[in-house]
């Protein structure tokens, strides 16, 4: 293969991730390198505009400049301003400058990243964004220096997430037989960022060449719409936790205004406290405490304020957290149920949450324990459970990464990998034999849905039959074949021996008549042994072969499924 490099830029509301992957013979598929800025892989999507000279600072530098007390404006969440007409122009200016900053950082690290001469760059965007915004984002990457219109591409976040999911979970997906060639599945992606949470529901399929098709039927449901924002982003939790702490501080400072220093410390440190302490503690079902910095400041102020109350920090366990943030989870619950209802209107294979086959959860805000609990059918904050039956029955169908903020960026650089999805059966197959319309065999499940193809299965049925010693009456042995998700909902089809069928996926019911006569005298008990052999090919076509042996006499039959 020719060596080349893919750069993936996931430009998020509060955080940006840039990944680089080199493609060459013998590479490790899952290897990719992050653009490291300030010692971290997560770049805060921040721009600080200093007042006196208009100088711009980006990422952690912007954060440091703001905390140092420099006079100016800290621009945050400006990605969302692309959707607001009166703020759009300023948002475009900031995004262009931010992309230039990323490219300058890339150039500094380019030697260590071993970048090839041939480079492709991908930038992600929400599936619901308009063509106008997508064009602007791609052009911003081109203008920054990452490439030309021929080498810079856009990719939807759900598509990128699928590539990351398959790269990191390929073995499990095969083991659980969750994906197969030419078998569409219903996928729901929940992307929870700092600004918003978005649900995307679509049909996914891998073709015979293992090429991925997202919304292959042209139907991708993205909810909410561009002009309808639900307040389900991480910054809403920040605000609610700020209020929780502020209520405590008002009890500590009764009858007076909370000290400005405490207010500022509460607001500036809330995100780090949330991510490094509150979320991990609640994940383990343990209580969280106020940050050490806040407690130190309270103790210091207490020595100067004798009226301060010595009140312990209220226990922030799961119950208290869900009470304080109930409105947030109610909106997320509504967002999800509305998205599924919308999908049910346009995707015939989806009637409700029980029809979702695979769920992908991404974004930094998805790390809250409440998200997993809700997806697994548990009640959160007193809200009714959502019946994601297939996910509840098999939690392995709920996929997330250890670092969910990096999922989309990883998927952007993994998109050129080849995936080995084996040929598998689209349906279950059951066979039952019946002698003379009155003596049935057991029902044999000879093939399971998602079973690897090609495969050969067989079973044997032995039955006693009485007849005259000179003549055994004609025996009719019928072979009933049924395929599908279950026997109750299967289609029915009747055909004779050697009937030509299109494929295994088109057959349902077969009847084969096997008349034979044995000559003799007197009365005897005959042993009738029927052997069935099923051969299913890679393309899903199947042949059922049968041998009937009655005291040495054999009748053969073949059914083409």
Q: PLM features: what roles do these ranges have?
A:
Residues 24-144, 233-289:
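Phosphate-binding loop and its immediate beta->loop->alpha context
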Residues 58-75, 230-376:
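Gly/charged contiguous loops adjacent to phosphate- or pyrophosphate-bearing nucleotide/cofactor binding elements
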Residues 135-140, 368-390:
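Conserved helicase motor "Helicase C" RecA-like lobe of SF1/SF2 P-loop NTPases
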Residues 139-184, 192-193:
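Hydrophobic, small-residue-rich alpha-helical packing segments that form membrane-like cores
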Residues 332, 420-561:
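Acidic low-complexity intrinsically disordered segments
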